[in-house]
Structure formats: structure tokens, C-alpha cells
Amino acid sequence: MAFGPAAMGYDRAITIFSPDGSLYQVDYAFEAVKKGWTTLGVKTKNAVVILGEKKKASQLLDVDSIEKVFLLDDHVGCSFAGLASDGRILIDYARNSSLQHRLVYDEPISIDYLTKLISDVKQMYTQHGGVRPFGVALIVGGVDRGVTKLFMTEPSGQFMPYQAVAIGQGGYNATDYLEKNYKEDLSVEETILLALNALKVTLKPGEKLGPGNVEIGFATKEGQFRKMTLEERANYLQKI
């Protein structure tokens, strides 16, 4: 995203709107999300799947140490695209909020409410001086009382429910694939394979999708949210 000299006076302060109604610092935060590794979520009647791509930015990088799918509570997980440090802060906040809710109310936090709490924090960082927006978008999904839920939170603090959503570098291509192939009545396995195929279409020539460069978390409407093992990921990748 490029801005001319006329815009420069408006992108220095987060609390000043430009004449066209933009907050340029928030727009810049969206650009950080677009540069992130491809991340997507799919929700059907039977399952919620969240997966995140892992890339080896350096030959010396231990890619196995990179975590892209996170457990927030027994019934809900998330992934993100954008600045990893910003994502880590919000994930820690979400985990603490989930734990406090359990301690106070003796029940799991609803996914809708947890997503709202995350988004409220993001929104606060768009209207105060001396801070900057979070340069990260989170995909949050899981199961509430047998009902599958999937949300995406934007750097602006807005959040929306989705049947399927993709963000990051390959977000456009993955979204196009999901729009053409999504069905609400897919089985658990079909939902997982749909998500993997959507990620596969984002790969550049010469790139391969292997169990070591993708993380997958899922929940069925009968069970809890959990992350797949390396062996489970390898088995599913053989089917696409």
C-alpha cells in the first residue's frame, strides 16, 4: 500500500482520520497481516479445522520449534497471520481470560465472548496516542455446546463469524478455492481435507506441503479442540 505526500500528515498519528475516513496506521497493520504465512479455518456442521503454514525463513531455523496453532481452552483454539510477537501477546491474553472465566463461573467461556474480548483489546489500540495497532489477525474456532464456531478478528478490532476464512500471503487463492468447494454437511475427514487442499493451492512452483510445514488443530461437535500429531498430518496429506 502506497500513500502520497498528502497522506503523510495523517499516518503519523493513530487517532487522526484522513479526509477519506481512513486510519492509516490501521491500514498498515492490515498490510502486516497480508505478509504473514497463510492461515485458514473451516467450519462445517461436524467439525472446525484451523491450520497454519510454517515456512523455513532460514536454513538454520528449527522449523519444528515454530507453533502456528494454539489451544486457548479445552474447546477452542486459534491461529494467526501477521506479527508473531503481537499474536503471542493476544494468545496469552485469551488463555488467561478463558482460565479466569472457568474459575469464576465454573464453566468454559463461550467462543463468541472470547473473540469479543480479544477484539476489544485490538480496538483499544486504535484510538489512543502512544500505541500502535496489533499487526495480526486471529482465526478463532471451536465448539460451544455441540455447535461449531469460527471467527476472524481484524487489526481494527472488528470480528465476524465465518464458515471458512483464509488470511496471510495465500489468503486470496485459498479463499477462492474455499468459495468454490465449501459444503456445510462435510464429514470431519472431508472438512480437514478441504482445508488442506485450500492451503495446497497457495503453494508456489517447487513448494511442497509436508507434515513438517503445516500445523492442524480441529474439534468435532462431540469432542474437544486438539492439535494433530506429525503422524496424523502425514496420513491426511497422503490423501490430497
Swiss-Prot record:
The keyword ATP-binding belongs to this UniProt entry's keyword annotation: no
Molecular functions (GO terms): threonine-type endopeptidase activity
Designated name of the protein: Proteasome subunit alpha
Protein's UniProt keywords contain Cytoplasm: yes
Described function: Component of the proteasome core, a large protease complex with broad specificity involved in protein degradation.
GO CC terms of this entry: cytoplasm; proteasome core complex, alpha-subunit complex
Organism in which the protein naturally occurs: Metallosphaera sedula (strain ATCC 51363 / DSM 5348 / JCM 9185 / NBRC 15509 / TH2)
Top-rank taxon, per record: Archaea
Inhibition and activation profile: The formation of the proteasomal ATPase PAN-20S proteasome complex, via the docking of the C-termini of PAN into the intersubunit pockets in the alpha-rings, triggers opening of the gate for substrate entry. Interconversion between the open-gate and close-gate conformations leads to a dynamic regulation of the 20S proteasome proteolysis activity.
